């Protein structure tokens, strides 16, 4: 990717460093005395590379696994005049998350949070021997029937948020991190939302220097 670039390796590495600490493209252009369009090009290339890297990860999640869904955006459907509900009845975009304790996180944009939809993602990403923790949403019904014999729920509806190891605090921490990070972009178009989501997944619990080294290796 970098062989045909007019920029030196030094400059590209500087752009990567700025990208990995979430410096906006406009500020990076000023800091490095480069054209804004040049920075936009590299930032988009980085996001496409990260997206491909994250979606190509094949190893299934194993161990203690937390699953949860979250909702992003504030879009209204044209012609809809009622109040927007919160959570699972909302018009916002649902995103499903899988969190491996002390390990990786995986996110996927889903059309809904029905049982069939969530089970398809879980079956594709989580090993059967794993211990799965979820809240009480009915979309998680039936996991035992498809082979996940160790499925435990925390009942948020009864103000229960943890019972020993039975909690989903890890994935909820990721959602908070994700929404704080994405808010810095002051609005992301639907076209690019998935790229930013995977970038945030890639960022989770990692130091900028580690990210910069990996990104440099990915684009070489």
Q: What name fits each language-model region?
A:
Residues 1-220:
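Residue-level recognition of single "structural anchor" positions
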